[in-house]
Design a protein with these regions (language model features):
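Extended substrate-binding grooves/exosites of carbohydrate-active enzymes
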Residues: 1-289, 294-300, 305-317
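Intrinsically disordered, low-complexity Pro/Gly/Ser/Thr-rich segments with frequent PxxP/GP/PP motifs
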Residues: 303, 309-345
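Extracellular and select intracellular beta-sandwich modules with Ser/Thr-enriched
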Residues: 316-318, 367-372
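Beta-strand/loop-rich accessory regions of lumenal/periplasmic or secreted enzymes
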Residues: 336-345, 360, 374-692
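Exposed beta-strand face motif in extracellular beta-rich ectodomains
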Residues: 346-350
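Short acidic/polar inter-strand loop motif in beta-rich domains
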Residues: 354-362
Length: 692
């Protein structure tokens, strides 16, 4: 194990290039302090100076504010790495290797923040690095030395690979090898990413030999620029001219934007890097267990806030001021929660957060350093049987069918009109109480695609999954019938591109509610790829720009990246859903939704509930506008044209994001949608005067 002052600390690290959006490689003291503040806010405790020594001031600030530093020498020959002429083996380059490592050590020797020396980056193994290792060990016997390219050889004290698969990490952690495993680069944070970060930290917390790693990387390395139309963008490779070689947006792998705005995936990092963990003991009685993961400090500097939520609404709250938990110790605590049986039939959630009593290390009093959400009583799915609504002393009038129109099947009720296009069987009009709930020309259609993320492009999913982009739907049946006073419309389709059948069923009651069931029956084809998502898509007029939902938030989240986002009731707008990743891609999804409302200023609109928690997104952008196609285009989020309506996606599930790398990795199997049978039911209910 790596020991710091005798303790086997966990390295909750990030790689940091010196980069500023306005001044390039010149980083001011103010910007450095901003970076350290953000690291503290998100529980990052270590930084690797990739791939060169930083400004001396950076080490001084790390000394002052408390960050572990891996001090890396300016030795990189990536371009020669995959040839037979690796500079690490050339005698003519021996002096250059050694002198750069000597200067790195000599200039930073007296900085207590430096706990590890790094010989360099991606230059290959060989005698030149062996000489550097021997010199450093003779010069400084107190600090370990690491070098990724040395692998398991003697001239690295730490096994510090890059982007090691989960399984390979576990295999090493279970082996008889004696060197600690600390990845010098892992969890490639490119674009909408960091899915599966939990799986890394499950292993790190399970195996003492696996002590963490350094995320690649801290900040998106783009500069502020204006395109030919005068639109301000963050520029990346290829934006400056067409003739210089570039790696496109491969410089944008950050946890934060160039302007130091946390990217949505940063919140997941902050959660799994936290050092106070809460576990349920008997939540019915308010009993929890606290584990202090810190190695050098107790919890006396913090207080605990707790909240009890019933179906997402705050019903009780309290504070515990004294937390006497020693480093690496556990303690049980009983919170003053009333009888939970008084909230019968409601989903009960217990939120706890740990906050600073006083300001420290650039953080304000009351800042939350750790949190947890625990289920006291589980969520119960709603009754999905749709029947006519009986009004007091008024006989309900069943909806009727008008099949006389040549283009549309029309369903009418006392206060609504619903139309289905006869040519394809899709819902095409939804008017309730005089209000059009679907955009003119829009339809409710099956959807299996998303705008590929950077990781999707790296795994070539835009090619591999291409068959799911608007697969051919050949309508084979279109019927309607009355059933218990409701109208049932059914449409069947052949899907020859994917060897499947699709069935869409709509049950409509007397108030204009619609239960939609999307069912796919897979054929026996063996080579149909996974899907990006399974769900439906529709367009609503732009007046329905308000979002009110009970699910995970407030930031976007995905099936393999939603542990930092708590369940609750959130009130947002459509404009807030789009996150401007430097290159346009999938964004804005929320998961584990119990209900979702799309409302106008008056609080009227549509409410969606499903047979199980579902996913949704609402954007002023189409999927097509965020999709670069078969190959990445030279595009930037501010250049994408918004539409004048709300594009709404309601999904049973969506593919996870992955994080092992951005050049082939895809989400863990449990976060994928393999070819097979799927069924998804949800109810669309017109609502009025809902408080936003």
């Amino acid at each position: 194990q790596l020991l710091v002052n005798g303790q086997p600390v966990l390295i909750k690290g990030a790689n940091r290039h010196e980069m500023d959006p306005d001044y390039g490689y010149v980083v001011s003291r103010e910007r450095m302090l901003q970076d350290i503040r953000i690291m503290k806010q998100f529980n990052i405790n270590a930084v690797r100076t990739c791939h060169y020594p930083d400004d001396n001031l950076w080490y001084e600030l790390c000394d002052e504010y408390g960050l572990y530093v891996v001090a890396e020498a300016n030795v990189e020959a990536h371009g020669m790495l995959y040839t037979n002429n690796q500079l690490s083996k050339h005698a003519s380059f021996a002096k250059a290797h050694l002198e750069r490592n000597q200067r790195n050590v000599q200039r930073s020797y007296n900085h207590p923040s430096v706990i590890i020396w790094s010989l360099g980056n991606e230059t290959g193994p060989g005698p030149n690095f062996e000489a550097c290792y021997r010199w450093i060990k003779a010069e400084d016997a107190t600090r370990p030395v690491q070098y990724e390219q040395a692998g398991h050889d003697y001239y690295t004290d730490i096994f510090c690979p890059m982007y090691l698969w989960y399984s390979a990490c576990e295999d090493y952690a279970k082996s008889n090898a004696t060197k600690p495993l600390i990845q010098c680069e892992y969890a490639h944070a490119m674009g909408n990413s960091m899915g599966g970060f939990k799986e890394y930290w499950d292993l790190i917390r399970k195996y003492p030999k696996f002590q963490g790693g350094f995320i690649w990387d801290f900040v998106d390395q783009s500069v502020r620029w204006k395109n030919k139309d005068g639109i301000e963008i963050y520029a990346y490779g290829g934006d400056f001219n067409k003739y210089d070689g570039s790696d496109n947006n491969f410089c944008d792998n950050g946890l934060i934007s160039p302007d130091r705005v946390p990217n949505p995936h940063m919140y997941e990092v902050g959660y799994f890097y936290q050092s106070i963990w809460t576990h349920p003991v008997n939540l019915q009685n308010g009993e929890i267990e606290i584990f202090n993961e810190n190695f050098f400090r107790d919890l006396s500097a913090y207080y605990l806030d707790w909240q009890l939520l019933a179906d997402g609404e705050l019903v009780e709250a309290g504070t515990v001021s004294n937390l006497n938990v020693a480093p690496q110790q556990k303690a049980k605590l009983k919170l003053d929660i009333s009888d939970v049986n008084s909230y019968k039939d409601k989903e009960l959630l217990l939120n706890v957060s740990y906050k600073l009593k006083k300001a420290e290390t650039l953080l304000s009093p009351g800042f939350t350093v750790a949190k947890a959400q625990m289920s006291v009583t589980p969520y119960k799915a709603p009754d999905m049987a749709l029947v006519n609504v009986k009004k007091a002393n008024i006989e309900s009038v069943a909806p009727s069918v008008n099949n006389n129109d040549g283009n549309y099947l029309i369903i009418e009720g006392e206060d609504f009109i619903i139309e289905f296009a006869k040519n394809n069987g899709f819902l095409s009009r939804y008017k309730v109480a005089g209000k059009e709930l679907m955009n003119d020309g829009g339809q409710l259609v099956p959807n299996f695609w998303r705008a590929p993320t950077d990781n999707d492009y790296g795994a070539r999913l835009q090619h591999k999954y291409r068959v799911w982009l608007n697969p051919k739907l050949k309508r084979t049946s279109f019927t309607n019938k009355q059933e218990n006073g409701t109208i049932v419309v059914e449409a069947g389709y052949e899907m020859p591109d994917v060897s499947a059948k699709l069935y869409l069923t709509y049950v409509i009651n007397n108030t204009g509610e619609i239960k939609v069931t999307q069912k796919m029956v897979a054929g026996e084809a063996e080579k149909v790829p996974d899907m990006f998502r399974f769900g439906m898509q529709m367009q609503m007029p732009d007046e329905f720009y308000r979002i009110n939902y009970y699910g995970r938030g407030p930031v976007e989240n995905y099936s393999d990246r939603n542990h930092a986002t708590d369940l609750g009731i959130y009130r947002q707008t459509v404009a807030e859903q789009f996150y401007p990743y430097i290159r346009p891609q999938e964004t804005g999804t929320k998961t584990d939704i119990r209900w979702w409302r799309q409302l106008n200023e008056a609080g009227s609109g549509l409410q969606f509930v499903a047979e199980a928690p579902f996913s949704a997104s609402a954007l002023n952008y189409t999927i097509e506008s965020l999709d670069d196609g078969l190959n990445k285009d030279q595009r930037h989020s501010p250049e994408v044209i918004q539409v004048d309506y709300t594009n709404l996606c309601i999904d049973k599930a969506q593919l996870g994001l992955a994080c092992e790398n951005s050049w082939g990795a895809i989400a863990y199997p449990q976060y994928r949608l393999p070819y097979g049978n799927y069924e998804f039911s949800f109810i669309m209910k017109p609502v009025f005067n809902k408080v936003y």
